[in-house]
Every structure is written in structure tokens, then in C-alpha cells.
Amino acid sequence: MKTLGEFIVEKQHEFSHATGELTALLSAIKLGAKIIHRDINKAGLVDILGASGVENVQGETQQKLDLFANEKLKAALKARDIVAGIASEEEDEIVVFEGCEHAKYVVLMDPLDGSSNIDVNVSVGTIFSIYRRVTPVGTPVTMEDFLQPGSQQVAAGYVVYGSSTMLVYTTGCGVHAFTYDPSLGVFCLCQERMRFPQSGNTYSINEGNYIKFPMGVKKYIKYCQEEDKATQRPYTSRYIGSLVADFHRNLLKGGIYLYPSTASHPEGKLRLLYECNPMAFLAEQAGGKASDGKQRILDIKPDSLHQRRPFFVGTEQMVNDVERFIREFPDA
């Protein structure tokens, strides 16, 4: 049995940014995940369910667990003095850690993806993304350090809190998964160098918004539903409503996750920096693909901290197919 800590140290030689700082940073995220795991498991017993009554910068009501997870991860990262600053879906602006100007890295995170599912005991997750800062070490970080294209990520990953808690991450040398053993308090290696299956037969989308989708996406959904033995259609529809949970299932089984633009959200709804970029990095490292329907997600240069984007991620051929439909059936 190999623990996450042992694995990270063992694999340091495989990536160019191997330093003790990055290892300690991943360890801090691991600690934050353990704390969130502990409290999610007793969510119905303590007063951390439901809405907080506070709205974030996007005008969305924050759940109590959103704020709890954000504070716990922020504290875990700040305590190690190895992160110069963070950006979070739950914070209006970047958070600069005073006294950490010497640190090389910044972290972007969605502390609790799918938090509205907690009340009904459905899987949720944490998403994180790590970049090497571009401003000089020794100075406070600025917005420039956070508005980097996803191709510049040093590491990314997610934690899925479900029937078991799993941490999945990449440093650009494959995707590896670890299952949390609460009796020992450690994450243990369960899958190394994960890969998307070459073909998939599952599509994950909120079809309740069908009427609002672009024509190309509507045509793709109909394609998924048509019978064709050569392509193993019709495909199966599976949608949990938590990006982490839907992505994790499709990574294991083969499939595509779709969150297109809609009439009410013409720029898409998922955040480029906190959701799309880290999941795209993981997807590509696992042999999959991620796109906004027209271009590679990791090539997009962000222009704002909470920028949104349409998102299609999963088995490469399935993402290619939806891109083809979007090209062939443009909206007027």
C-alpha cells in the first residue's frame, strides 16, 4: 500500500517543477480535503447545511458548506507559508497572503463543487489548480499571476466526496487516484496513470435546459439518442449535477460532460479558472479532450477572475463529435 505522500515524493523527478514547496502545497490541499471530508460526513448532524444568506460576486447564494470549505482550504494553504495567494470561486477578489511574498505558487480553487447536492446526500467535490507565479518572487502577487492560460498549470486535481473520498491529481505526468482510508487517516494509491476509454457511450448534460441550447448542441443530443449499432448508440444519459462526480464517472467509464451556453448564460456558466482549466488539464493528461465548442480550453487567455465559458470534456472522439455539430449547425 502506497500513500499519497509517499507517491508524491517518489514521482518528484518526473516533473520539471519538482521542489519541496510543491510537495508541501499538495500536502496542504490533502489536509484541507480531510477536514472537508470529516464535516461533510456529519453534515446532517451540525448546522452546516442550507444557504448562508450571503451572495457571491456572481449574484449566487452561497451555501454554508461553500464558505466552510473555502475557509478550511484557505487556512491550510496559508499555514504552510508556501502559497503567495489564492483565488477562489467564493472570493470576490484574489487573496494575497501577507508574509508569503517568497512563495513561488498561486492556487485557484472551487472549494465545494455541487454543494447544493449536499442536502440530498449526493456526491460533491473540491477542484484545485496550481500555477507558478509570473511576477517576481519577493513581491506581492497581482492579478497577472492568476490570469494565466490553463496550459501553464503546474498541477491540478479534484477530490470527490462520495461513497468513498478520492483525490485525483496530475502534475503533467499522468493522472493518479487515491482513496481516503479514514481508519488510518491517509490517502492510498488505488489507480495509477488513469486513461479515458477510447470510446464512450454516456453523455452528461442537464437536458431540462434543452430549449435554451445552441442548435449544434441540440443536434448532438439527438445524435446521442438515435439508434445506430455501428457507434453503439443510443448513448446513456447520466447527469448528477456535480461537475466532479460527472467527470469522475466519465473518466472511469467513458463519456462526455457538456455545459453549453444558453439563452440566459450566453458565455456559459462554468468558471474558466476554477472549473474548466483544472478539469481540462486532467482530461488531456488522461487521453481525453476539453473544448469550449470551438477551441481548446487550455489555450484560452483569461481576461477576468470569474470568467465563464461553455465546457465540453471527456472521451476525445465524443468531444470531436460535439465540436463538429457546433460547426455544422451554427446559430443564426
UniProtKB/Swiss-Prot annotation:
Listed EC numbers: 3.1.3.11
Cofactor(s) for this UniProt protein: Mg(2+)
Primary location recorded for the protein, binned into one broad class: cytoplasm
UniProt keyword annotation of tRNA-binding present: no
Binding site for Mg(2+) 2: 110, 113, 275
Molecular function as annotated in GO: fructose 1,6-bisphosphate 1-phosphatase activity; magnesium ion binding
Enzyme class of the recorded protein, top EC level: hydrolase
Catalytic reactions on record: beta-D-fructose 1,6-bisphosphate + H2O = beta-D-fructose 6-phosphate + phosphate
Residues reported to bind Mg(2+) 1: 89, 110, 112
Gene Ontology terms: biological process: fructose 1,6-bisphosphate metabolic process; fructose 6-phosphate metabolic process; fructose metabolic process; gluconeogenesis; sucrose biosynthetic process
Keywords, ordered alphabetically: Carbohydrate metabolism, Cytoplasm, Hydrolase, Magnesium, Metal-binding
Cofactor binding note of this UniProt entry: Binds 2 magnesium ions per subunit.
Chain sites annotated for binding substrate: 113-116, 206, 239, 257-259, 269
Similarity comment: Belongs to the FBPase class 1 family.
Subunit composition and interactions: Homotetramer.
Protein name listed in UniProt: Fructose-1,6-bisphosphatase class 1
